[in-house]
Each structure stands twice: as C-alpha cells, then as structure tokens.
Amino acid sequence: MAIKFTQTSLDKIEKIIQESGYVIRYERGNFQSGYCILQAKKVVVLNKFFQIEGKINTLIDLMPQLIINFDALTHDSQKLYDEVMATAKEK
C-alpha cells in the first residue's frame, strides 16, 4: 500500500517517532540531507521549508536509523510502522 502525501499521513508518521520518545523539530538549516538526528537527546530536526511530500519522504528515509520501540507503539502505529519499513526497504 502506498502512503499518501497528506497532512494526516505526516501526523501519523510523526506520531510513531514521538511515541518512541523522539522530539521532532522543524527549523531552518543547511543540512544537505534535509534532516539532522541528535541521537543522545532523541531529537530529529527537519528542514522547515520542505513541502508535505518532502517531510514524509524524509521521515520514511530516516526511520530505519532511529531506535523505535515497537512494543511502545499503539496498534495503529505498529501497522503503519510495518508499512513504512516495507516502503523504506523498497527504496
């Protein structure tokens, strides 16, 4: 199933990351990849100038790099996480 590029999809993907204890911040920056991960503080900083599609793609790309506690996720988040990870592996 393809992930739709809507605000609702973005909110759901953000929820997965937040349920794992990470803080997502949207800020200006000159990161080449469009994001920066501060593992020690569990902070993910994304380029605030990205459109919704760019934000979703960036979160999908970086999710395999994050430490996600699958058991701490809600049932809906677990299903979406599996879907996102399958999408990330296809890339």
Please annotate each region the language model reported:
Residues 1-32:
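Auxiliary, metal-adjacent structural segments of Zn-dependent hydrolase domains
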Residues 15, 36-44, 82-90:
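Short amphipathic alpha-helical patches
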Residues 20, 28-53:
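Active-site scaffold of zinc-dependent metalloenzymes
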Residues 33, 53, 66-91:
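Post-HEXXH active-site segment of zinc metalloproteases
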Residues 43-46, 62-67:
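Short, low-complexity, polar/charged sequence segments that are solvent-exposed and flexible
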Residues 52-64:
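Short alpha-helix carrying the canonical HExxH Zn2+-binding catalytic motif
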